[in-house]
Swiss-Prot record:
Lineage, uppermost ranks: Eukaryota, Metazoa, Chordata, Craniata, Vertebrata
Keyword terms of this UniProt record: Cytoplasm
Main location class: cytoplasm
Subunit and partners: Interacts with BCAS3; the interaction is requrired for the association with the phagophore.
Name of the protein this chain belongs to: Phagosome assembly factor 1
Gene Ontology CC terms: phagophore assembly site
Similarity-based family: Belongs to the PHAF1 family.
């Protein structure tokens, strides 16, 4: 049985690990994977057809804990303990829930002190006792007690008193004063772990198509040798097609991984693929997992030739490998009445809406089958790749975009950076 410390408006954990509000989904999954012998039977719950309409949930069934992640930013929004009999809980080092201590209203008062009157929910038949960043739900013993706690009974004053001996049915940890209005907080500094994250990624374009990326980056910076002076650092960097490997390293730092392509599976769709001379060396990717970006370099020139932006939707083969890339892509509208107008494609745009703006592709999509080995099948099914305006949109079966690949001819010279402008 897990023995965990409750920190209102912040976290639930122990000396080995901690689920912290604002934590990225990937970090929570990494904790579960590392401690898989202790924390077992974890379920991932999401809406397959409408992944943005419901929270993404990690359900720790063995331990009675549910982690709710915001569907958009994929950061931890609410920590719910839904079965208190499966876990030990303490506050400031003192247990208020264990096999020997029942979490009664008297025990909660003793451990957490006074707060506002409890609020009765007649639909759930539960009392909610709210502290800042922490709520307890109490179950009424019988239906006969319910009417006197209705708001219109005794001018609402009866709801000031939760019945003696009532025990906690659920506990919630969240940010702010209201569970209903809570949002996932910004990522805590403790979750950066030396990584750089992208707050937003803007696709730059010229008259012919995409030309590069402008990234707004977040990092945890420290004062001179004092950890307590740690604070969020925000800065911008730009990388372009034709930039050298050294240019990218100086802008974004070292990648999490370098991946060398063994073969080009899309080469068969290029004109006269059989006439292409086999290369003696392979193109390679810089994988920036916390940015949600891959950068492909030409094996001969070591210049940028492609960018890949990942949306990290559940139900995709690469889910949870990349942090979600919050991109914005300007699209050139070619309709007669558009008059050179541009529209913005984002991480949350659906393929149908993009097709309405750009027109349907001339060619049929390329069907992409992913699997870990030739003998394995992908349980999430195939995706479809459409090419438009020097971009390849990988589309899932629910009409959401899984990734966008930007490509273009390498530029002959290094791109003039903003900092170098007169």
């Amino acid at each position: 049985m897990l023995d965990l410390e409750v920190v209102p408006e912040r976290s639930l954990g122990n000396e080995q690990w901690e689920f912290t509000l604002g934590m990225p989904l990937a970090q929570a999954v990494a904790i579960l994977q590392k401690h898989c012998r202790i924390i077992r039977n974890v379920q991932v719950l999401y809406s397959e057809q409408s992944p943005l309409s419901h929270d993404l949930i990690l359900n720790l069934t063995q331990d009675g804990i549910t982690l709710l992640f915001d569907a958009f930013n994929q950061r931890l929004k609410v920590i719910e303990v839904c079965e208190l009999t499966k876990v030990k809980l303490k506050y400031c080092g003192v247990h208020f829930n264990s096999q020997a201590i029942a979490p009664t209203i008297e025990q909660i008062d003793q451990s957490f002190g006074a707060t506002h009157p409890g609020v009765y929910n007649s639909t759930e038949q539960l009392f909610h006792l709210n502290f800042r960043g922490l709520s307890f739900s109490f179950q009424l013993d019988s239906w006969t007690e319910a009417p006197k706690y209705e708001p219109n009974f005794a001018h609402g004053l009866a709801s000031l008193q939760i019945p003696h001996g009532a025990t906690v049915k659920r506990m919630y940890i969240y940010s702010g004063n209201s569970l209903q209005d809570t949002k996932a907080p910004v990522m805590p500094l403790s979750c950066f772990l030396g990584n750089v994250y992208a707050e937003s990624v803007d696709v730059l374009r010229d008259g012919t198509g995409p030309s590069g990326l402008r990234l707004r980056l977040l990092a945890a910076g420290c004062g001179p040798g004092v950890l307590a002076d740690a604070k969020m650092r925000v800065f911008e960097r730009a990388v372009y097609f034709g930039d050298s490997c050294q240019d990218v390293l100086s802008m974004l730092g070292s990648p999490h991984k370098v991946f060398y392509k063994s073969e080009d599976k899309m080469k068969i769709h290029s004109p006269s693929p059989h006439k292409q001379v086999p290369s003696k060396c392979n193109d390679y990717f810089f994988n920036y997992f916390t940015l949600g970006v891959d950068i492909l370099f030409d094996a001969n020139t070591h210049k940028v030739k492609k960018f890949v932006l990942h949306t990290n939707y559940p139900g995709h083969y690469n889910f949870n490998i990349y942090h979600r890339c919050e991109f914005k892509i300007p699209l050139a509208i070619k309709k007669e009445n558009a008059g050179g107008q541009t529209e913005i494609c984002t991480t949350y745009s659906k393929w149908d809406s993009i097709q309405e703006l750009l027109g349907h592709p001339v060619e049929k999509p390329v069907v992409l089958h992913r699997s870990s080995s030739p003998n394995n099948t992908n349980p999430f099914g195939s995706t479809f790749c459409f090419g438009l305006q020097r971009m390849i949109f990988e589309v899932m079966q629910n009409n959401h975009i899984a990734s966008v690949t930007l490509y273009g001819p390498p530029r002959p010279g290094a791109h003039l950076r903003t900092a170098e402008l007169p």
